[in-house]
Design a protein with these regions (language model features):
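Signature of N-terminal electron-transfer/Fe-S-associated modules in redox systems
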Residues: 1-160
Length: 160
């Protein structure tokens, strides 16, 4: 790659090791990436990863014997408000037709459920996994800015 684009090999290596979507070793048909940044960690991403590894019987970056699954870590996915979350890189249509789907508000039980649906060939709905959340809104609905704000006490600044 470095020769083709005429850059130093270290530059290619830097990019390939920085971005988690570049796989430098074999991954499963479904590569499960657990968010490893602070908001997701606070909300339980380590427990999510442990549940996946235990259920699949692999270590991080290993591929299951059937070749279907691998588990890795990914840095911020940009949906911190819906932490914790995972990405499923779906290579079932080959490396040229892959998709990335975000599963937000996941629990250890929910990620196992997602894995089992994928194993059966089903496509679990992506996005929030919390039925009480509407898109990125708070679970249970808004709690602030429910009405028009009060006007300032004095509209005529010259009179104040």
């Amino acid at each position: 790659v470095a020769k083709v684009i005429e850059v130093a090999p270290i530059r290619v290596y830097e990019v390939a090791t920085f971005y988690s979507m570049f796989n430098r070793s074999k991954v499963g048909k479904y590569h499960l990436l657990v968010c490893g940044t602070t908001p997701c960690m606070i909300r339980g991403s380590r427990e999510i990863e442990e549940a996946l590894l235990k259920h699949l019987g692999v270590k991080r970056n290993e591929v299951t014997q059937d070749g279907f699954f691998s588990v890795g870590e990914m840095e911020c996915m940009g949906c911190c408000v819906n932490a914790p979350m995972i990405t499923v890189a779906d290579y079932s249509n080959g490396s040229e037709g892959y998709t990335y789907n975000y599963y937000e508000d996941v629990t250890p039980e929910k990620v196992v459920e997602i894995v089992e649906k994928l194993r059966k060939g089903e496509k679990p709905p992506h996005g929030t996994q919390n039925p009480q959340r509407i898109r990125s809104g708070p679970a249970g609905g808004n709690t602030t800015l429910l009405s028009d704000p009060k006007p300032p006490p004095c509209r005529d600044l010259d009179a104040c």
